[in-house]
């Protein structure tokens, strides 16, 4: 890219909601600035905000209006992200802000992702406070979630750096809708990511997400091939929208060919929400068919989610096919992995594992972050 892209400045002191941001350039008209953070490339006049509604042209520079602000903090099981092969059973301090750079009609977190009220992100915390809270709460990791952390990349990156200094892992739960110029700066600070691959056609992304598929595929390929990030993928299957067996076959073949067979794939059930309420939940049979398609394509770790299906929430050894992690909901029932290998046949198990699993279970603990400042 020949144009000069402004990167995030080093600003040690800030007022929440007014942190100067990065990844933008001046437009040729000399009036607008163009946000380069995501593939939309929103051109903003003074006072304008982008599609995400949280990145603003303020006095000729991008300002992150949700930096230091959150819609809430909660300690969750890591499997809820979902990440089934990243320190299983451990607790993760989760938080998000407001806004999103996609416009999914089926969004399950639409009260936050589609919020136009930045003041709804009423809790404030700096990165060091979040890292300290994670340590004091006994959390193995911090997750940037609930809404897409890409649009608050500066806040996520600074928090990830503080967490790394404190010995805490970081997780991005994201759509992967990020530009090439911002991609490495964001993901190089993350230890794990669950990326939503929402469908596998451009028509689906255009009609249901107001976005494009190709940038997501580019992000997934970059994470798998050029980063050390532990990657898992979620595919929410929506009846009549992205549930074609042929499309699922193409998606699974692409994952194996481009990312490798060891990337876990979660097939998640749709429930009517936000604007997409004209159809029922995903039939369990559709999830089971998708599971079988993925196995036949060669994906080694496959899960179902948002349904009661205990058998397909276990982690199976790709060698002997025995369950090396048995689960009941978010509770770990048994753990047969030692030094990254199956204890039954010694085949390697892909993931990031401690010697013993965590014991957080299914608990959900809301956190008042002000108590940790």
Language-model segments: residues:
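Generic structural "secondary-structure junction" signal
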Residues: 35, 44, 53-54, 64-65, ...
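Cys/His/Pro-rich metal-binding microdomains
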Residues: 36-39, 53, 98-101, 105-108, ...
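A generic "binding-loop/recognition-motif" signal
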Residues: 48, 100, 201
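Conserved Radical SAM active-site core
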Residues: 57-192, 360-370
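Conserved AdoMet/S-adenosylmethionine-binding subsite of the radical SAM
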Residues: 124-285, 290-293
């Amino acid at each position: 890219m020949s144009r000069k892209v402004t990167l995030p400045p080093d600003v040690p002191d800030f007022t929440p909601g007014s942190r100067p941001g990065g990844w933008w350039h001046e437009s040729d008209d000399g009036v607008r600035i163009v946000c380069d953070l995501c593939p939309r490339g929103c051109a903003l006049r003074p006072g304008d905000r982008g599609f995400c509604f949280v990145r603003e042209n303020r006095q000729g520079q991008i300002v992150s209006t949700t930096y230091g602000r959150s819609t809430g903090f909660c300690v969750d099981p890591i499997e809820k992200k979902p990440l089934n092969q990243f320190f299983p059973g451990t607790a993760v301090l989760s938080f998000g802000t407001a806004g999103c750079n996609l416009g999914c009609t089926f969004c399950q977190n639409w009260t936050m992702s589609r919020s136009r009220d930045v003041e709804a992100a009423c809790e404030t915390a700096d990165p060091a406070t979040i890292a300290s809270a994670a340590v004091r709460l006994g959390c193995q990791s911090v997750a940037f979630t609930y809404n897409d952390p890409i649009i608050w990349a500066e806040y996520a990156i600074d928090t990830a750096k503080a967490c790394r200094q404190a010995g805490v892992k970081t997780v991005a739960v994201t759509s992967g809708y990020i530009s090439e110029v911002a991609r490495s700066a964001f993901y190089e600070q993350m230890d794990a990511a669950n990326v939503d691959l929402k469908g596998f056609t451009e028509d689906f992304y255009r009609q249901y997400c107001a976005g494009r598929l190709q940038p997501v595929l580019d992000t997934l390929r970059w994470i798998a091939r050029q980063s050390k990030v532990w990657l898992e993928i979620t595919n929410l299957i929506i009846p009549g929208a992205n549930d074609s067996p042929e499309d699922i076959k193409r998606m699974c073949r692409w994952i194996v060919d481009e990312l490798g067979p060891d990337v876990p794939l979660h097939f998640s059930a749709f429930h009517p929400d936000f604007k997409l309420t004209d159809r029922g939940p995903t039939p369990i049979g559709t999830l089971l068919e998708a599971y079988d398609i993925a196995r036949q394509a060669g994906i080694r770790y496959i899960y179902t989610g948002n349904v009661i299906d205990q058998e397909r929430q276990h982690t199976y050894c790709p060698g002997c096919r025995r369950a090396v992690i048995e689960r009941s909901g978010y509770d770990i029932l048994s753990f047969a992995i030692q030094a990254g290998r199956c204890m039954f046949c010694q085949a390697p198990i892909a993931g990031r594992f401690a010697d013993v699993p965590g014991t957080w279970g299914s608990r959900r603990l809301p956190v008042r972050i002000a108590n940790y400042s």
